[in-house]
Amino acid sequence: MRAACVAVALALLSACTTVSEPVRPQARALPDTERPVTRPGATPRERIVEIATQEWTRWGGQVVRLGRDDTSCVTYSPVPAPELPAPLPEIPEAQPLSPAVAGVPAAATTDTESKTNGNPPPVASCLSFPDGTGMEATPLGCSLARRYWSIVGEAPGCRQVTQGSWAWSAVFISWVLRKAGLDERQFLTGQSHSMYVVDARDGILPRPAFHIEPVPAMPRPGDIICAGRGRDRYLEDIAEIGFGTTPMHCDIVVGVDPATRVVRAIGGNVQQSVSMEEIELGDSGRLDGITNSHMPWLLVMRNDLQ
């Protein structure tokens, strides 16, 4: 009888100490002892904002303005503007022959006046950093970015960090949220933004830290704002976001100024650094997908934590 009681007690103890597996596959983080320091008594939402801001400061405080005039420009950077190859001289355009002289029917002529697909031309005075330049191409930037990759078990070299195939914006957010204390019941890390966006959309976690709200919306500090990229730049239906397959970009909101209609958000791999984006809101005074074509916002991941 006593032996049976001991066996039952051991079984119960084993059940209590068993670590449950996450609800979806998640890369195992590399060993890491870094513990960012935040204000005593800070709430989880406040810790997210504080840690994101600390990282932005470590990267030198780069600022990017997303203007109501549909521009996206670096307004401050700790590194000088990149030395880019000079543009090739323009070749004088030959006077086109008339359709009759060219021996082509007039109806067959092609309109080649615009090849910009309706996008505004680049502004010559607008500072930007192509891949392989900016803070991520410095020894400090490389060492900082590699920390973020460790949260998903990767250890890329400095050359990889500067390549587009190793875009690190999603692992930056994953790193910040995990360091802020969110556990696997609240948030799962991912190499792609669409992984944790789909988690929040589908409500798969036991104690989700976020839920999805489509734009237009007014975000709050601690929320995460996301836009489609590439082929899904103007995605309209959140239901179409595929897990790990839809290209996206997301930033952590750290400040909102309704009076000036500006949202401040910090993101990784923005102009090759951790940058603060000063997002100028449109006439509605809310975040939307039409005010700036460089970042057509799609959704807000609402932070449900204190």
Where are the model-predicted features located?
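Short, solvent-exposed loop/turn and secondary-structure capping segments
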Residues: 64-65, 187-189, 237-238, 276-278
